[in-house]
Curated annotation (Swiss-Prot):
Annotated NADP(+) binding sites: 71, 126, 134, 153, 220, 224, 253, 255
Keywords: Endoplasmic reticulum, Fatty acid biosynthesis, Fatty acid metabolism, Lipid biosynthesis, Lipid metabolism, Membrane, NADP, Oxidoreductase, Transmembrane, Transmembrane helix
Presence of keyword 4Fe-4S: no
Subcellular location: Endoplasmic reticulum membrane
Species name: Aspergillus niger (strain ATCC MYA-4892 / CBS 513.88 / FGSC A1513)
Membrane disposition: Single-pass membrane protein
MF term (GO), any: ketoreductase activity
Family, per entry: Belongs to the short-chain dehydrogenases/reductases (SDR) family.
GO biological process: fatty acid elongation; secondary metabolite biosynthetic process; sphingolipid biosynthetic process; very long-chain fatty acid biosynthetic process
Stated name of the protein: Very-long-chain 3-oxoacyl-CoA reductase
């Protein structure tokens, strides 16, 4: 107690001995620092709003002339299919790359029917197999085309949220092989031509799972975090060549991967989401602190801003809340599986 009293007396004496002028200077400095912090945060938010709702992105035509090609991986369903359709509408020829040949043929016919002036090519390859022969075929196709746009959409997630210790090895391997290695290998085949032509656009589908550590989707979350770092690094490397690289940060979208069918303010359908991506190229949207990245869909952008600029993404509270949400999803998925199993047994 005497120790505390002694030091409080010293503090009191220091305060009393501090000259009034210095007190004013100190208070002014604190006020200025606080005001600067508040103003900077406000300006960031204004920038986010302008990026999401007002300012246009780069025109797609700036990446290549009419009749140049767009390569879309994971093209047969969902986002990939919608990217292909909207790029075809913008007069790009389309190289469709995905696993199922019949789905690719169906989409190819749909594109040429809707847009008669657009050419299509298809390549059926399973990115999970990581076969050199498939990438050799892709290289042969790419080398003979003027590829202006690459959409790295191919991806895989867990069948349901699962603790890492219980994740099947084949599922874990497929996620890393498809999301990471497949994206890298496809990009490495396309980029040299873009560098030679001094133009191009490389879009890679990211995820909030790459921003937020996601318990029970640990491997998927890690793969998307890898893509975030890789794409940002690639963006800096290719910018001097006139190539725009952008990782698209997305929350939930109605798709086969998300297993969500109903849209809402925070869960758009593929058409709305892809439109926001293609009309906001070069704008960060809700991700002002991430170079060469964007959260272009308005509600996703506001969520990304709040997470990255207000709450932070790596804190224990945020991670715990994310864990709780996915534990709940897992419980519902397991109950649904049990009900379906019961129906089959009867």
């Amino acid at each position: 107690m005497d120790f505390l009293t002694k030091h409080l007396d010293c503090l009191s004496n220091w305060q009393l001995n501090l000259q009034p002028g210095w007190q004013t200077v100190g208070a002014s400095a604190l006020l200025a620092a606080g005001s600067l912090f508040v103003v900077s945060r406000a300006l960031v938010f204004v920038r986010v709003l302008l990026s999401l709702f007002v300012l246009p992105g780069k025109p797609l035509r700036s990446f290549g002339p009419k009749g140049s090609w767009a390569v879309v991986t994971g093209a047969s369903d969902g986002l990939g299919k919608e990217f292909a359709l909207q790029l075809a509408r913008a007069d790009f020829n389309i190289l469709l790359v995905s696993r199922t040949a019949s789905k690719l043929d169906t989409l190819s016919n749909e594109i040429t029917t809707k847009f008669p002036s657009v050419q299509t090519k298809t390549l059926a390859m399973d990115f999970a197999r990581n076969q050199d022969s498939d990438y050799e075929k892709l290289k042969e196709l790419v080398d003979e085309l003027d590829v202006s746009v690459l959409v790295n959409n191919v991806g895989k997630s867990h069948s349901i949220p699962t603790p890492f210790a219980l994740t099947p090895e084949d599922e874990m391997t497929d996620i890393v092989t498809i999301n990471c290695l497949g994206t890298l290998r496809a990009t490495q085949l396309v980029v040299p031509g873009m560098m030679q032509r001094k133009r191009g656009l490389v879009l890679t589908m990211g995820s909030f799972g790459g921003l937020l550590p996601t318990p029970l989707l640990a491997t998927y979350s890690g793969s998307k975090a890898f893509l975030q770092q890789w794409s940002t690094s690639l963006g800096s490397e290719l910018e001097p060549y006139g190539i725009t690289v952008e990782l698209v940060q997305a929350y939930l979208i109605t798709s086969a991967m998300s297993k969500i069918r109903r849209t809402s303010a925070t869960i758009p359908d593929p058409r709305s989401f892809v439109k926001s991506v293609l009309t906001k190229i070069g704008r960060n949207g809700g991700s002002p602190t991430y170079a060469y990245s964007s959260s272009p869909y308005w509600s996703h952008g506001l969520m990304a801003w709040f997470l990255t600029c207000v709450t932070g993404t790596m804190g224990k509270i945020v991670v715990s809340q994310n864990k709780g949400m996915h534990e709940s999803i897992r419980k519902r998925a397991l109950r649904k599986a049990e009900r379906e199993k019961g129906k089959k047994s009867t």
